[in-house]
Structure formats: C-alpha cells, structure tokens
Amino acid sequence: MNETQIQRETRQVVEDVLEKTNLKQGALFVLGLSSSEVLGGQIGKESSQEIGELIVETILGILGSRGIHLAVQGCEHVNRALVVERQVAEQFDLEIVSVHPTLHAGGSGQLAAFKFMQDPVEVEFIKAHAGLDIGDTAIGMHVKHVQVPIRPILREIGHAHVTALASRPKLIGGARAHYPQDAIRKS
C-alpha cells in the first residue's frame, strides 16, 4: 500500500469533513480507525502500526492547526475507550480509565495517539462534535445528538470504507417554533 497515497487521501477527507461540519476551535473530533481495513484486510486481523501512525499523525497536524481536539477510539477490547490529551479530559470533565492500548486491544490508532500526543490518557466516553470513521469502526456512540451523516469527498482511504458524522442541536418546540439555519442541517 502506497503510504503517500494514504496520507493524501486522509488529508483530503479530513479537510473536506472539517469544511462541511464547520467545526470551531475547541471542538472534539473522534476518529475510529481500522488499519487492517485500510490495507484491505478484515477489521482487527491485520493491524499495522505504521498505517496507524501515518493516519493519526496526519490528522493531528490538521486538527491541531485549527485548535480542534482529537479523540481516538479504541476497539471493543478496551470497551471503545478513547485516547485524548489529559488537558482535554480535564477541560471536559471526562472520566480517565486505566488501560494502555496494544496493537490488538485498542489498536494502531490508539498506539499512535500515545506516541504523538503530549500527555495522552484513556477516557471512557465523550460527546464529540463530529468524527471520522475509517473502516466501519462504529463511532456513533461518541458523537453528540443529533448526529448528521456527512458524505466525505472520498468513499475510501486505502481499501477502508469511510464515513463521517457531524452533530447539530436538537430542534424543540413544535409547530410554533422557528429554527435558525445551520451549515449542516438538511433543508
């Protein structure tokens, strides 16, 4: 698999999703990543530390330049806990849990987050403003209600299917209420 191509596709998809979601500085962005799927394998079966590092480092660079916080979701073997910076866990009052990811429990994305973040910790749950799912890892449990599907510019990174979610405030009030337009709500 061509690493330059994977990096280019990752950059393209992330920048497109950020443009479509209109995330602000300080927002939380969740990443679900199967490096196995990126390489054309079955999720959890052919994990690649190199691919995890390439993708996470690329995404951290893009989000960091915009002041957006990354949370990297682990697999079911760590109960889908997430790696975030300690400062983010404290700022959002997230419960820190005790686990250190491995390639097959947490996955390559979490290992990469531990490598590239300043002070990484694992947290049990978050409510992200948006997120990217590379390889059908199921990030929905970590994105705020109401979730809005975002169709990225590319449908795959490497061989992995790619989807994205944004969130918008709930519409309440009934027939008499009026709602402001927002960038992601469908008309």
From Swiss-Prot:
InterPro entries, sorted: Antibiotic_NAT-like, DUF436
Membrane-spanning ranges: none
Pfam families: DUF436
Family affiliation: Belongs to the UPF0340 family.
Entries under NCBIfam families matching the protein: TIGR01440 family protein
Protein name in the entry: UPF0340 protein SPG_0604
